C-alpha cells in the first residue's frame, strides 16, 4: 500500500549478460525481474556485442514488468539507480542511457551504483528472519569478472585486501567447462559434478601467491595441458571420467 512516506526506487542492472530491474520501497524489494540471455550458450561465453543487442531488446519489457509487479507506475518513482560499472562497456551503456533518459523525463534523481559495492551491501536488504551484518565485516565477491576479499568498514568505505592477480574464478570455471564440453555457464554444472567425483583422482599445480591474493590462470592452463595429453592417449577420456 502506498503512503506519503514511501520512497520508491527503480534499480537497473546491465553490467554483463542479464538485464535486471527491481523496485524498492524504502529497503524492501517489491519486485525483481531478470531476463537471461540464452544466445551466449553456443559460444561458451559472453559475446559483448550480442550482449549489448540483447539488453536493448530486454530493457523496456523488464522495467515494465518490474513496475507492474510492484503495483506502481513510473510517476510513483522517487529515484532511479543504475549500474555505473564495472562491466562490459556496451552492456553498461544500454542500462545507463535508459536510466538517464527516464530520470530526465520524470524529473527525478539519478543514482550511480558500483555493482561490486552492491554485491557486498545486498545483505542489508530486509528479509524475514534475516540478520544484517555489523560494520566492519569481511566480504568476498566472486563473479565472472571479479574475485576479491574486501574489508567493509561502512556503506561507502571499503578496502580491497586481496584479489585475483589474473583470471577471476568465474572465468576459470567457464573456460575449464568449455574444455570439458559442459554447457554455459559451466559453474553450476562443475559444482554438481564435483560432488560426484573423486577429489584424489587427479592432481593439479597449486598457485604460489603472496598475501591474500589469488591466481587462477595457472590452474586453467594446467587443466588445458592435462586434457590435451589425456585425450591424445585416450580419445574418450572426458566422456569416461
Map each language-model feature to its residues.
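Conserved phosphate-binding catalytic cores of ATP/NTP-utilizing and phosphoryl-transfer enzymes
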Residues: 1-5, 113-137
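Short, acidic/small-residue loops that bind anionic groups at enzyme active sites
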Residues: 100-120, 164-168
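A short glycine/serine-rich beta->alpha loop
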Residues: 44-51, 82-89, 160-164, 207-212
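A short helix-loop
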Residues: 2-8, 15, 32, 133-135, ...
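N-terminal beta-alpha supersecondary unit
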Residues: 6-86, 115, 239-240
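Short acidic, glycine/serine/threonine-rich loops at helix termini
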Residues: 22-23, 92-93, 122-125, 150-154, ...
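Short Gly/Thr/Asp-enriched flexible loops that form oxyanion-binding sites at enzyme active sites
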Residues: 82-106, 125-126
Amino acid at each position: 500500500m502506498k503512503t506519503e512516506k514511501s520512497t520508491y526506487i527503480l534499480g537497473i542492472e546491465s553490467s554483463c549478460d542479464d538485464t535486471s530491474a527491481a523496485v524498492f520501497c524504502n529497503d524492501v524489494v517489491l519486485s525483481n525481474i531478470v531476463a537471461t540471455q540464452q544466445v551466449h550458450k553456443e559460444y561458451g561465453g559472453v559475446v559483448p556485442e550480442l550482449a549489448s543487442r540483447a539488453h536493448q531488446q530486454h530493457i523496456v519489457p523488464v522495467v515494465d514488468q518490474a513496475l507492474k509487479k510492484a503495483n506502481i507506475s513510473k510517476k510513483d518513482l522517487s529515484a532511479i539507480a543504475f549500474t555505473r560499472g564495472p562491466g562490459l562497456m556496451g552492456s553498461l551503456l544500454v542500462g545507463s542511457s535508459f536510466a538517464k533518459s527516464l530520470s530526465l523525463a520524470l524529473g527525478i534523481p539519478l543514482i550511480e551504483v558500483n555493482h561490486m559495492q552492491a554485491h557486498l551491501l545486498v545483505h542489508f536488504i530486509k528479509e524475514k528472519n534475516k540478520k544484517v551484518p555489523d560494520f566492519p565485516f569481511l566480504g568476498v565477491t566472486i563473479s565472472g569478472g571479479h574475485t576479491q576479499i574486501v574489508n567493509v568498514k561502512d556503506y561507502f568505505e571499503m578496502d580491497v585486501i586481496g584479489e585475483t592477480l589474473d583470471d577471476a574464478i568465474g572465468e576459470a570455471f567457464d573456460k575449464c567447462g568449455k574444455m570439458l564440453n559442459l554447457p554455459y555457464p559451466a559453474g553450476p554444472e562443475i559444482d554438481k559434478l564435483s560432488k560426484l567425483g573423486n577429489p584424489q583422482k587427479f592432481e593439479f599445480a597449486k598457485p604460489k601467491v603472496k598475501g591474500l591474493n589469488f591466481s587462477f590462470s595457472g590452474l586453467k592452463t594446467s587443466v588445458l595441458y592435462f586434457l590435451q595429453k589425456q585425450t591424445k592417449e585416450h580419445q574418450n577420456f572426458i566422456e569416461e571420467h
